[in-house]
């Protein structure tokens, strides 16, 4: 049995744990590369938003790690980012991720 077949046999819980791990890994990579400290509360907020967006993504097929990377990059550039996107529509955030539009939430705030 090859590794792909073994992966397909994982339980839903194990698959979820792998997704959460990939989200944490992306947050860690950005924080390390940007040399920033992110509080546990913000890490949890980014993780939860990334996971919710990943589950909500029906059309763009974005990976959980890609979503987490984008959100963490936005936070690294503007530490008020999470507050600013708290009430935004998920489709707007997903579209921004797909377009690599790191300033999308600024446009929303100006409206």
Where are these regions (language model features)?
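Gram-positive cell-envelope targeting signals
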Residues: 1, 110-111
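Extreme N-terminal leader/activation tails
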Residues: 1-13, 19
């Amino acid at each position: 049995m090859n590794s792909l077949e073994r992966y397909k046999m994982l339980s839903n819980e194990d698959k979820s744990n792998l997704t959460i791990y990939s989200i944490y890994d992306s947050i860690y990579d950005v924080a390390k590369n940007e040399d920033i400290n992110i509080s546990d509360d913000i890490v949890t907020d980014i993780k939860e938003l990334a996971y919710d967006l990943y589950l909500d993504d029906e059309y763009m097929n974005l990976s959980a790690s890609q979503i987490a990377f984008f959100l963490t990059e936005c936070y690294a550039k503007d530490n008020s980012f999470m507050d600013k996107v708290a009430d935004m529509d998920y489709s707007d955030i997903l579209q921004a991720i797909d377009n690599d539009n790191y300033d999308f939430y600024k446009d929303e705030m100006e409206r």
